[in-house]
């Protein structure tokens, strides 16, 4: 059955905290009671407000099935740390950066993990023993194109999937969710930024730009529903084959060129949730092991 947004939110809230919280849901206690009674009547909850097998089945179309890491780049701004390893495999406090996201995904019950590799790709094989869920996909085009070439290698896997950069240090693993109702991107509300940001309208992304005001600083973590993930292959193929298309970031396709075909919710987080390590100096500030003794 097709769930309404509020039915979905109540079911997921009950699965996560075993109690429908009006504050978390953004509605009144009366509305929560009405929704709970409706879900009990439909057999999605039992009398103790526990999600039933029928309720779990109703949530299945919204379940996150996989995480795709785009990890083929050079990470040149992080040299010398990236001379011998790709940026996602640079260690922070003794652990490769990418492990923070892999472990957060596994904690959320997401079992399929794909890593598109390129520069020093063999280094990612070190992950296979600890994380047997990981599947490695090679991108031989990483030297001559932007990350759109990595997205092209996995374009048919983007349904019910997170698609993200592999060099984000996840400080708050709860940003990874087992269920999503809509496609979304992760962003922090800011008054002004010189970085990549999302211009939104009524909570939905309308454009991705470099530098903006009253916008959302973008963390490149996207979720795609089954319906919208199915649109991505054709749009990526068309952009990739267009003049200059190989030089673009992959998310220019859904966020800019073909945005009218997508409904991408801006999911808010904070700068404390994720660390972006863009330079060697930032790496040193985060982990004193990189300071010259």
Region annotations inferred by a language model:
Residues 1-28:
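Short amphipathic alpha-helical interface segments
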Residues 3, 12-15, 50-67, 218-293:
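Conserved alpha/beta core of the MobA/IspD/sugar-nucleotide pyrophosphorylase nucleotidyltransferase superfamily
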Residues 8-18, 57-117, 121-124:
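N-terminal glycine-rich phosphate-binding loop and ensuing alpha1 helix
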Residues 9, 21, 172-245:
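Conserved core of the sugar-phosphate nucleotidyltransferase
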Residues 26-41:
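Short amphipathic alpha-helical interaction segments
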Residues 40-50:
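A short, conserved structural fragment
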Residues 88, 133-135, 263-265:
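Conserved beta-strand segments of alpha/beta enzyme cores
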Residues 124-196:
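Conserved beta-loop-beta/alpha segment of the NTase-like Rossmann-fold superfamily
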């Amino acid at each position: 059955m097709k769930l309404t947004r509020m039915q979905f939110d109540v079911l997921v809230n009950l699965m996560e905290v075993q109690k429908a919280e009006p504050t978390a849901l953004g509605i009144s206690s009366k509305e929560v009671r009405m929704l709970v009674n409706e879900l009990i009547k439909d057999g999605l909850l039992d009398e103790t407000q526990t999600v039933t097998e029928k309720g779990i089945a109703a949530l299945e179309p919204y379940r996150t099935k996989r995480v795709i890491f785009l990890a083929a780049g050079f990470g040149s701004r992080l040299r010398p740390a990236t001379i011998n390893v790709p940026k996602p495999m640079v260690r922070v406090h003794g652990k490769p950066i990418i492990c923070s996201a892999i472990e957060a995904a596994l904690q959320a019950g997401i079992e399929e993990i794909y890593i598109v590799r390129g520069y020093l790709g063999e280094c990612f094989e070190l992950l296979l023993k600890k994380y047997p869920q990981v599947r490695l996909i090679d991108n031989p085009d990483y030297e001559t194109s932007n990350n759109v070439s990595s997205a092209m290698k996995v374009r048919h896997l983007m349904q019910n999937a997170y698609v993200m950069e592999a060099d984000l240090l996840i400080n708050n693993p709860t940003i990874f969710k087992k269920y999503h109702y809509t496609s979304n991107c992760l962003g922090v509300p800011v008054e002004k930024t010189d970085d990549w940001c999302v211009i939104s309208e009524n909570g939905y992304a309308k454009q991705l730009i470099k530098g903006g005001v009253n916008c959302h600083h973008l963390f490149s973590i996207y979720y795609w529903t089954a319906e919208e993930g199915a649109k991505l292959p054709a749009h990526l193929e068309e952009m990739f084959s267009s003049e200059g298309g190989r030089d673009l970031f992959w998310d220019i396709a859904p966020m800019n060129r073909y945005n009218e075909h997508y409904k991408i919710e801006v999911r808010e987080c904070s700068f404390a949730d994720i660390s972006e390590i863009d330079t060697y100096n930032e790496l040193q500030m985060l982990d004193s092991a990189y300071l010259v003794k």
